[in-house]
Amino acid sequence: HNANIKFQIKICEIDQIKDNIDIAIIATNSLNRAILTEKLLSNVTVKNIIFEKFLFQNRFEYTNIKNLLKEQKVKAWVNQWMSSSIAFVEMAKWFGNDLQEIKVEGKNWGLACNSVHFLDYLDAITGRGKLTVKENNLDSEILESKRLGYFELTGSFTISSESGVLLHLACVDEKDLDNNKITIKMKGKRRYLEASLSLGTLKCNYYDDDTESSFKEYAILLQSQMTGGIIETLYDTNSCILPTYEQSMKQHLVLFDCFEGIFNKQLKLDGCCPVT
């Protein structure tokens, strides 16, 4: 904790903000986030922004905000925690260069809104090259989200990193079942692990050449529990462990490639993903 950082809580409209801002966290829903960002940056100078995911609903907004951030020299990151999680970093390091495939499966875990965390993980551990949709087997039916006006998807799709590591994401909908446990399987030529992620705990079995070698349990902090440390580090060092805006933009637009055809067909929306 840095005792030199002083906090002040004030609730006001954007056009009432008069002081320049060191760090802004833009945590609206995806429909309003781009509009709010434009309004904020037209009113005051902002040094750093942390966006929440899912970033924006409309494809064109990604480039517009990218250009605006560049024009105003704003540093920006997106709150995707997985690639900097101690547990997930350790899992990737255990494989070294041996990793070939990651499979993520579960029930009602929010495929549309949460896949971007796993995309950033794949992106980070494979050198942040090009990401490509290899398979798209999403169900044609869309589901209403818990938030009015937003939707979820089920089915599966596969993304490939530039180095050839595959990420397979799958989700099924089971009515009246509020079980968002996720199973994660990572496979290499010699090594394999299977992990279960649920309620802030990751339980992981590591196997080497088909022989169980170890078991480890990790505590996974909620994003809200990590925010304070992220802000303090950014304030002290002018650096951030989260993916940059442009890295996250690339990942989101890959998801647009997967999702927007279904939303266009079902909701008659062009270039739009109503996910938050």
Predicted segment positions?
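Amphipathic, non-transmembrane alpha-helical secondary structure
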Residues: 15-18, 34-42, 89-92
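NAD(P)-dinucleotide binding in Rossmann-like oxidoreductases
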Residues: 150, 160-232, 239-246
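Rossmann-like dinucleotide-binding domain that binds NAD(P)(H)
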Residues: 102-181, 246-250
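Short acidic low-complexity segments
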Residues: 7-20
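Beta-strand-loop-alpha-helix segment that lines the small-molecule cofactor/substrate pocket
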Residues: 23-26, 30, 34-81
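C-terminal helix-rich "cap/oligomerization" subdomain common to oxidoreductases
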Residues: 23-28, 232-276
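NAD(P)-binding Rossmann-fold cofactor-contacting core
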Residues: 1-4
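Rossmann-like NAD(P)H-binding beta-loop-alpha module
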Residues: 82-102
